Amino acid sequence: MKLDSVQIRNLRNLQHVTFKPSHGVNFILGINGSGKSSILEAIHYLGFGRSFRTSKHKNVIQNEQESFTVFCECLEDSTTQRLGLSRSINDTVSVSINGIKGNKVSDLVSLLPVQIFTPQSSDILLGAPKLRRKYIDWCLFHVEHSFLTCSNAYSRLLKHNNALCRKQQVGYANPQRVYWTDLLAQYGSELTEFRNAMMTRLIPLITSNLAQFLPEFCVEISYYRGWEKGLELNEALTKSADRDYKNGYISVGPHKADVRFKISGKPAQEVLSRGQLRMLVAALQLATTQCLMSYTQKTCIFLLDDVGAELDAAKREVFIDRLLESNTQLFVTAIEEHQLEFIDKYQNKKMFHVEHGQVREES
């Protein structure tokens, strides 16, 4: 999927912006506060239904306006898709797919795979396991059609089982508790099979990328499924039942899964510098882009915010080259032109200048 045109209304300082990006790489230049990152934020809304800068949608709406809207025309296999999203100040959402309106964000975002690399991207390695689970699940959402149904079912069952744990009058042997635990084990095992299969695909891609991005290190990658080795999930749930009943929540299962990175037996986070961690993240994100292309023939839209702050000149060039090899459409922001000195070699490119919320294409 490639963006042919983008329209943005009342999003931060972008009051009325329309531009036609290149299907290759788009460089967006502007000083801090000009609105260049808000362009990426608008595209991110189409791919995720939310901002990467704030959890409060009303903060994104321009002052004295009731809502913001992002609309795009996309090209896929010579077919044009018209997609739109609007969020109001009272937090309601409306999506539009080829003129048909609804409020199911997942229908929209499934059509437009978007990834983003920002100054906060290292959080996937430094933050909680939830962020690394999201990494796997993003790829599964776009590759496996039945994944979302399974994941949502597991989340609902986990919430219900946690509630049962907190009900002192419901003991573990109670038939109601046994029934819901069995269902949890069923969907949890299915979810784990999805993730195991995806990691089997991703690990060779990540390893290959690291050979180019961090050749001086041997990074060991492993997937922890969320419970003890040698046990089925229903056995692990039975084994932990007394503890879970006492604590009031389920302590084992795919909601405790993690992806672990080690170098010489030590966590990679303790060995690598901040810049090296960014290159590990770049290898991870490139791998999901490659996986998407290999297994679905879908292309990804990739947002690279503040390229000068995140990657040195040589690394940013290699990263962009590899993304373009996967037929990715890129949007790259920078503050100063010297951060983009390497761009002359790219044929399929456009340069945009942003100033006070106005976007101008360089001829």
From Swiss-Prot:
Its job: The RecF protein is involved in DNA metabolism; it is required for DNA replication and normal SOS inducibility. RecF binds preferentially to single-stranded, linear DNA. It also seems to bind ATP.
Matches recorded under Pfam families: SMC_N (PF02463)
This protein's GO CC annotations: cytoplasm
Any one GO molecular-function label of the UniProt entry: ATP binding
N-terminal signal peptide: none
Originating species: Pseudoalteromonas atlantica (strain T6c / ATCC BAA-1087)
Keyword terms: ATP-binding, Cytoplasm, DNA damage, DNA repair, DNA replication, DNA-binding, Nucleotide-binding, SOS response
The protein, known as: DNA replication and repair protein RecF
Residues reported in the UniProt entry to bind ATP: G30, I31, N32, G33, S34, G35, K36, S37
InterPro entries named in the record: DNA-binding_RecF, DNA-binding_RecF_CS, P-loop_NTPase, RecF/RecN/SMC_N, RecF_2
GO biological process, one term: DNA replication
Family: Belongs to the RecF family.
